[in-house]
């Protein structure tokens, strides 16, 4: 089987990760003790992608839980599915990273990283055919961002040919935990650009807007935000967990989605959006799902896809529906909005259909877009970074852990390069290539 090793780091990563395991355990008919109570063979057919089978027919998540302080992991352990995880896979320190990237990446995190890698290695060795790793973390704090990126580069060193996939929660001005988030995020992006194959950018601002506008929640809690994230993660991983007509694994997804190695930051979306409390589900049609899925309001990253163009798109539909209708609707969207898709990648929209819908819904759709509009997110962080860095504000917290200002400058310019690369491909057209070829032909003729 093609296994995935899941790692969750830091407070945010552990909270999102715990929700993810709750939702997919439910979808696979696995209860909080790891026992199977399902009703369909499909639930078990690819169960090994995320679960190990233990003695007594129990299913145990192939998850490694990491943090530099014990608090969050205690709450995961005492949470609804806390007993399903393997106790040895909780790896934590006592000191905390204090929202300081340098502590997570260079000092405190570096001390803990080897014991984490031991657990990761153990999980990887028991795999039949490991396809890759997925990490849930945030970029604004200290542990998820600093130690998370340290883990990525160490795992990359040891497993260079395996796919590395991250679900990264990007800080936003509206929902800010700490003032140094722009520093931590920029230093993290600097690492992610080089060391991951696929990164799903999840943005608290976008999640807040969805909860507030669409779901009509007056005071959204982190629980509500994390619920949205876990819906999206469940949708994105559907193809990996269930047999379907278009069976994706992490590598196939990367091949379809990443036209240039650095441009691997995706914008996820989900439809239909219904709040946790509201159970009045109406029967949705495929056209409505398709329409909603491409809507800017449904994006989990606070970027407007209409401000950029899609390089590639993957859509995953779930539920019993006609493939023909799905294909027609997807073509319809592309034809009506052709200016928003780059014309130099033909057939850049891929669609998969899985028969098993998420709990409580007849059908749903998950959207993964590689859009040049994601540059808005990096620009936003970069502006905040520059404002502080120009005055060297808060730098002593980082240099005190042995970091050099040079590293900040490098991270800043790497992120600005990333923005320019997205911009370059946003403006590129197919005719430029034609002109270029004509010029070359002209040169050949002259010679």
UniProtKB/Swiss-Prot annotation:
Mg(2+) binds at residue 69. The lineage of its organism: Eukaryota, Metazoa, Ecdysozoa, Arthropoda, Hexapoda. InterPro entries: Beta-tubulin_BS (IPR013838), Beta_tubulin (IPR002453), Tub_FtsZ_C (IPR008280), Tubulin (IPR000217), Tubulin/FtsZ-like_C (IPR037103), Tubulin/FtsZ_2-layer-sand-dom (IPR018316), Tubulin/FtsZ_GTPase_sf (IPR036525), Tubulin_C (IPR023123). Keywords: Cytoplasm, Cytoskeleton, GTP-binding, Magnesium, Metal-binding, Microtubule, Nucleotide-binding, Phosphoprotein. This is Tubulin beta-1 chain. Belongs to the tubulin family. The modification Phosphoserine is found at residues 40, 339. CDD domains: beta_tubulin. Tubulin is the major constituent of microtubules, a cylinder consisting of laterally associated linear protofilaments composed of alpha- and beta-tubulin heterodimers. Microtubules grow by the addition of GTP-tubulin dimers to the microtubule end, where a stabilizing cap forms. Below the cap, tubulin dimers are in GDP-bound state, owing to GTPase activity of alpha-tubulin. GO terms for biological process: microtubule cytoskeleton organization; mitotic cell cycle. Its cofactor is Mg(2+).
